[in-house]
Amino acid sequence: MGDHDDLRKFITDLAVVHGRVVLSSGREADWYVDLRRVTLHHEAAPLVGRVMRALTADWAYDAVGGLTLGADPIALSMLHAGGDRPLDAFVVRKAGKAHGLQRRIEGPDVSGRRVLAVEDTSTTGQSVLTAVEALREVGAEVVGVAVIVDRGAGDAVRAAGLPYRAAYTLADLGLVA
């Protein structure tokens, strides 16, 4: 098996939790995909970095990140995955800090840079579009949005004028919306 198949197995074995849950979007579901169980796993995290780099290999960007907490381990996995180009990672806070440098985006400066916004999974696109807005406010050029598992956010992200890619769909994981 390759990285893509190996990561899918980690997701289905570790991250898919069956039972009634309320998603951050407010919608209810009979299962939950808890990707932190994968993105923070010692064997799966390197796969996340390689799969997400491969998914976006034809997009030109030099920094990756998104809204904390879902995007953080993805960005770090991509940063450490190596590849044909170096990447910086950044973290977008939900709100600016009231102390210190009062930055909303932590890490290397992204002003004037081409960046990729990532998220672990997305149903409505709200979290990643919040990150995109913050990135644009500081002058970053967002080249696209990439998620590990798409729960339906593609239309909303594309409607915001951004290319969108997902490493896996719900069907890829044997789940129905």
What are the residue ranges of the model-derived segments?
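PRPP-dependent phosphoribosyltransferase catalytic core
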Residues: 2-10, 133-177
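Conserved acidic residues
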Residues: 62, 113, 143
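Short, glycine/charge-rich flexible loops or terminal/linker lids adjacent to PRPP-binding catalytic cores
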Residues: 72-116, 124-129
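Active-site-facing substrate-recognition patch
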Residues: 1-58
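Short, well-ordered alpha-helices that flank and scaffold nucleotide-derived cofactor binding pockets
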Residues: 50, 54, 76-80, 133, ...
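Short acidic, glycine/proline-enriched helix-loop-strand junctions
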Residues: 59, 74-87, 154-170
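Short glycine-rich phosphate-binding loop at a beta-alpha junction
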Residues: 59-70, 146
